């Protein structure tokens, strides 16, 4: 509606790998007073063309999802003739670093550790995604004949993520059998009992 201030959505669902229609949402919001934030944590380094083509005001990314160090990310606000600068207020106050948005010293080593993986992921994403497709195919061949459901829209899903439910089987039992061959968890990374 015309009263909506912000739309925030994930580029890719972190548990199912389903790719969200951010380009369409960005296009629908263009020309409105609504700000558009994209959480590209899961898609950055894999779907960068989608990010280049989306009309967003704000973008969040992180280094550790592309083999960079933990503890560093980026919050990007677009500012040009077609994008209004969002009215973002700092979470902490102090010095005038980062145009007053963030006090303290920038962690240069972490920033440098973010730069190379970002460059490499942009150049090598197609090769990486093809490798993930091959691994996903092998995995699905290995479970062929079992009673399972792939969760999420498989037509619009990252090949690097599989969310699967095995019917009538205890998740912990599966984990014990295949943990040497596959990297997986039986819960989200946010869940304290997760092995992710």
Predicted regions and their residues:
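Pyridoxal 5′-phosphate
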Residues: 1-196
């Amino acid at each position: 509606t015309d009263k909506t201030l912000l739309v925030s959505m994930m580029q890719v669902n972190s548990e199912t790998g389903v790719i969200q229609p951010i380009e369409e949402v960005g296009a629908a919001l263009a020309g409105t007073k609504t700000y558009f934030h994209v959480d590209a944590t899961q898609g950055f380094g894999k779907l960068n063309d989608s990010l280049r083509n989306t009309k967003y005001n704000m973008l969040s990314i992180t280094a550790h999802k592309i083999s960079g160090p933990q503890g560093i990310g980026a919050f990007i606000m677009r500012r040009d003739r077609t994008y209004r600068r969002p009215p973002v207020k700092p979470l902490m106050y102090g010095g005038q670093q980062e145009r007053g948005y963030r006090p303290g010293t920038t962690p240069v080593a972490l920033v440098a550790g973010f730069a190379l993986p970002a460059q490499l992921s942009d150049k090598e994403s197609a090769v990486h995604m093809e490798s993930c497709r091959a691994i996903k195919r092998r995995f699905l061949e290995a479970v062929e004949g079992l009673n399972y459901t792939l969760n999420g829209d498989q037509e619009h899903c990252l090949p690097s993520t599989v969310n699967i439910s095995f019917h009538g089987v205890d998740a912990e039992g599966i984990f014990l059998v295949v943990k040497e061959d596959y990297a997986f968890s039986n819960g989200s990374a946010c869940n304290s009992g997760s092995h992710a």
